[in-house]
Amino acid sequence: MKKIIKSLIILIAVFNANSVFAQQDSLSVKNLDEVIVTGQYKPQTLKKSVYQVRVINKDRIKQSGATNVQQVLNNQLGFRFSNDNTIGTTDVQLMGMSGRNVKILLDGVPMIDRGDTRESLGQVDINTIERIEIVEGPMSVSYGSDALAGVINIITKKSTKDELSVTAKVQEETAGKEYHLFNYKGVHQQNININYKKNNWGFTTGGTHNDLNGFGGDAYGRDKDWLPKEQWMGNAKISYDKGPLNVYYRIDGLNETITSRNPINYSNNIAIDQRYITDRFMHQLQGSYTFSKKLQLATTLGYADYKRRTKTTRHDFEKNTDELTTGDGEQDLSKFNSFVFRTTLQYQLSNKISLQPGIDINREAASGQRISNNPVITDYAVFISTEIKPNSKINIRPGLRFIKNSVYDAPPVIPSINSKIALSKQLDLRLAYAYGFRSPALRELYFYFVDANHNIVGNPNLKAENSNSFNGSLNWTTLPKNNMAYSISLAGFYNTFNNQIDFALSSPTSNQYTYFNVNKAKTLGGTLENRFSRKDLAATLGFSYIGFYRKLYDEKDYVKEDDKEFLWSPELNASISYNLSKLKTKFNLFYKFTGKRPQLVTGKNASNQPVLLIAETDAYHLADFTSNTQINKYIAVSAGVKNIFDVTNISNNAVASNSIHNAGYNVAIGYGRSYFIGLNFQWNKK
């Protein structure tokens, strides 16, 4: 495997003898000035932003052949995904921090999750995405809770031309070696979108069907390693844009069914099946009005409705009948809803000073058999930031957020300061400090699940987690010349986290688990990213090295077998894209090496003493090769190989003792090498 890494590095070096680097993930010279909106007063280029932002544009998404957002992010530096194949869910990690510290936005509106696992990231229709903007580091002044590690803002497509456009897509993919045309085995996706814009009005609607038929299992298609997952997604949008007024309403809907078919009990020919059924609706009404060149108003209203049902049935193979089971927790319905109101005013006092005051109100409610007392939490916040430009080279942006929460003790004031200094036309320095916080999830506050095998309750006295974050970056970019561009980004960060919420026994003599503000943690690391593009060729190379430190609340009760403070893990990624203009074909190779991930776990030594051990998850390599060919004006074909190294599971030499869903010593990564082919149709009429 080391030879593979060296070969990739040498190959990129041939294309780019100067080994140059970049901060965004697009494969085009013109995209060095990509326009972004996340955390900005108004849309502006990456180069002008005070934040360090990564952008994954629609071309990169198309080139990947991905059927969900996780597949797009999986080869990005700092992103790792953990799969819980017991219940069919996936969570994200960003720069060493878990998904509960990452804010997921859809067009700037927070997406709701039932707990601290970011399942919502896999419940967005990838065919509607224009680009993904990633801001690393706390964004709590602008976006409130959960944005300790950063923000992932998914920007959907918008109609820009007066025309009628119809797009359709069918993609067939194997799951490892398993495949059957259109159903039964493999991965199948169908999509259709219709866009219409006339004068000031725009209308968009579309739908997608995703069908993963699982992977592995016995001869009867049961007891699968990867659970079957079927998704139906739909969306509609109507917009009006005239002069200073821009307003739109959008609705997104999802129905998802994850099926767990357990092995047959041959003594009575009966099997137990479970289905996890999710229904999600997300409404957003957004508008902006420009009073003058110096004064703009933007307002967002959002409402999300989320339901998740557990349905357990007893299937009798002799009678071919199904009946609902009656065991504790085997039939469950949990409901969550959220309301968001956000308004901001952008005012330019002068060429050197701009202000952005704002109001942010968030309300969350939950109910269900495992949620006690039908809780409601409301968060009220006002915030203000200002951009100060003493000259054309310096931009300083301090900000404050003031919070009042109806349930828990939130930090009363959240400060941040970001700065950008243009050291030259090609060299930019960014420095930042931010205080971040994460509010307790409803599940952590009010969860209640007691049966013969579980005794878990929430803790309504939890406090908000908080963090102090310091980060900086140095970005150098050449001026594009002769269709050639070079850029380099060197970034570093240091974060401390306090009052981290964790799952533990309520007392040493009890068998009841609950949540406490118990842990402290730190992350320290750096990234080096590179880009080279010339005519039809583009290449990227990146490296990260991130250290993690975690102090357990009961650490004094354990013997430490290693005095290391930080546990380190490396990553390396690379990509090459070449466009054969005459054949109207683009070839793409994406690669990522994920190094060993050490972690602190509890156990016992040879003397039966409780000890803190360092466990390691094995390193692994992922690579995809894809091609995109434009057959004619209307039809394009995409094809390729994913997971070239055929990675399915990696080893973990220890498992934490308080894992709720313990799948053993293997960590699921993927369902092996897979092949795909997709047919894309597009028709436009002015």
Predicted segments with their positions:
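Gram-negative outer-membrane beta-barrel transporters
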Residues: 167, 356, 391, 485-496, ...
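Extracytoplasmic beta-strand/coil segments of soluble accessory domains associated
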Residues: 70-109
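Flexible loop and strand-edge segments within Gram-negative outer membrane beta-barrel domains
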Residues: 212-297, 303-337, 662
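Short, acidic, small-residue-rich periplasmic hinge/interaction motif at the N-terminus
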Residues: 23-62, 99
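Short acidic/polar hinge/loop motifs at secondary-structure boundaries
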Residues: 110-137
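Outer-membrane beta-barrel signature, preferentially recognizing the C-terminal barrel domain
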Residues: 135, 272-290, 334, 408, ...
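C-terminal beta-signal and adjacent terminal beta-strands/loops
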Residues: 438, 593-604, 628-686
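Outer-membrane beta-barrel translocator/receptor signature
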Residues: 115, 128-130, 141-153, 158-218, ...
